[in-house]
Amino acid sequence: MVSYMSKSQTDGLEFVLTLSCPDKPGIVYAVSSFLVQHSANIIDSQQYGEPDGGLFFMRVHFSVPQPRPVAELERDFTWVAEAFHMSWRLHGKSERIKTLLMVSQLGHCLNDLLFRWGAGSLPVDITGVVSNHDKFRGLTDSYQLPFHFIPVTPDTKPAAEAQLMSIIDDTSTELVVLARYMQILSSEVCKRVEGRMINIHHSFLPSFKGAKPYHQAHAKGVKLVGATAHYVTPDLDEGPIIEQGLMRVDHSYSPERLVEAGRDVEAQVLARAVTWHAEHRVLLNGNRTVVLGG
């Protein structure tokens, strides 16, 4: 099955091609030949073939000598994709993914992402911040971004999720980041945004799921605390893992100190996951991911 999608019809000099397909000889040669035919220069390239001969994954960042429309390059690449039954996408390197941030009452991840974005080191276009609390309106306003306060109760959850999806659609949001948003989303919402919603879980999955993982870790006497960034699926905290991080601790750490240590890890792990997604480095492989050049 061949699939592709362009994000823009604008001309560009640099592009990122990502693809996956059944592994067989000749894939790299075919892609390289296509690039040579278009006088393209490979700036960066990574690839991975599953050891059992299953799927092949590739990401190529290349430039062309004259501005070219994405649609034109897509059309020319179609014959290569069809020959190898590729699922693929071509992105203009300068295009930034429209990203919506969501938060509840803990702002360390939100603050970190906004700071990186303001400093120019987070390669996304933030469309706004959604929260079920009004706590971070001032922080959001300081970055001159829209703040959407959507309270959630069991009775209002369907209406709140409808409002959320309306914001996503109206802003053409391509990525949603749950920066410690603590409401459990319905299966319907998870399915609609599958593959484009990232959550940070305050634990090194698959251990210590659910509420108060640091207290669970303290009770177990762990020597490491961590965080996991993963794509959201209808199965809670079971989505494909993008990135994980760890910090060494010892017996002297109280639950409160473990929380403080873990928050630093959470912010770093989430920022890396968002960056890799925005740079088109993360390719899905069933319930796993392949991160090329992360």
PLM features per residue range, with description:
Residues 20, 100-102, 130:
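Short hydrophobic segments within beta-strands
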Residues 41, 125, 146-148, 196:
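Conserved beta-strand segments of alpha/beta enzyme cores
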Residues 141, 145-171:
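Adenosine-nucleotide cofactor-binding segment
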Residues 133, 156-160, 171-294:
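Donor/substrate-binding cores of folate-linked one-carbon enzymes
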Residues 2-97:
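A conserved regulatory-domain signal marking ACT and ACT-like small-molecule sensing domains
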Residues 124-135:
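Short internal beta-strands
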Residues 99-109:
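Short, glycine-rich nucleotide/cofactor-binding loops
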Residues 108-119:
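Histidine-anchored nucleotide/phosphate-binding helix
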